[in-house]
Regions:
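Transmembrane beta-barrel wall of Gram-negative outer-membrane proteins
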Residues: 1-103, 127-134
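Generic structural motif recognizing short loop/turn segments at the entrances and edges of beta-strands
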Residues: 24-25, 117, 143-145
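Short secondary-structure boundary/capping segments
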Residues: 45-48, 105-109, 163-165
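Face-selective signature of the C-terminal outer-membrane beta-barrel domain
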Residues: 82-93, 97, 125-166
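Intrinsically disordered, low-complexity, charge-biased terminal/linker regions in eukaryotic proteins
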Residues: 84-85, 102-104, 109-117, 122-124
Length: 166
């Protein structure tokens, strides 16, 4: 297992709250993170076993070199407003991951793949999550009645951007 620079992790965070007139407050938070990780394996081995009577049988045996480049970025931001009459909060969360993989090796025909010999596999996959939680708490009749509202629209996607064999 070899690692190639630039494996890197960076993070930035900021938050604060402010007092306003008439016992009101407003606050914010923000966080940004980035990570990259590059790995290389000289002795990659893919092996799958199937249970067949009376013993386990090796059905796939591929060897070679594997390189992997993973990138991860996330952002979390939000604002809040509060007063005697209630509090409202909204946040925004974004997470994205990209992964590139390259394999150069010897591949054996296994029924799934009709190829015997030396070859290359290159792939790129990207995953993404977006979430926007909102909540509101309101007081009425001098605090005798409370009304709450919250919802969180969320979206997730997986993109198989690229897959090549040769």
């Amino acid at each position: 297992n070899k690692s190639s620079s630039p494996n890197l992790t960076l993070g930035f965070t900021s938050s604060n709250s402010y007092d306003l007139k008439n016992e009101r407050k407003v606050g914010y938070m923000a966080s940004l993170n980035y990570r990259s990780n590059i790995s290389y394996f000289d002795d990659y081995l893919e092996s799958r076993y199937e249970k067949s009577l009376p013993a386990f049988a090796n059905t796939v045996y591929n060897t070679g070199k594997l390189g992997k480049d993973e990138r991860f970025i996330s952002f979390l931001g939000g604002i809040a407003y509060g007063s005697k009459k209630g509090k409202q909060k909204i946040n925004f969360l974004f997470i994205q991951n990209g992964e590139s993989t390259a394999i150069q090796g010897d591949f054996l025909n296994n029924g799934e793949n009709n190829y015997d010999g030396v070859g290359q596999i290159k792939s790129y996959v990207q995953r993404q999550i977006i979430s926007i939680p909102f909540s509101s708490k309101n007081y009425f009749l001098d605090g005798k009645l409370e009304a709450n509202l919250s919802f969180t629209p969320s979206f997730s996607r997986v993109y198989d951007k690229d897959f090549k064999t040769s």
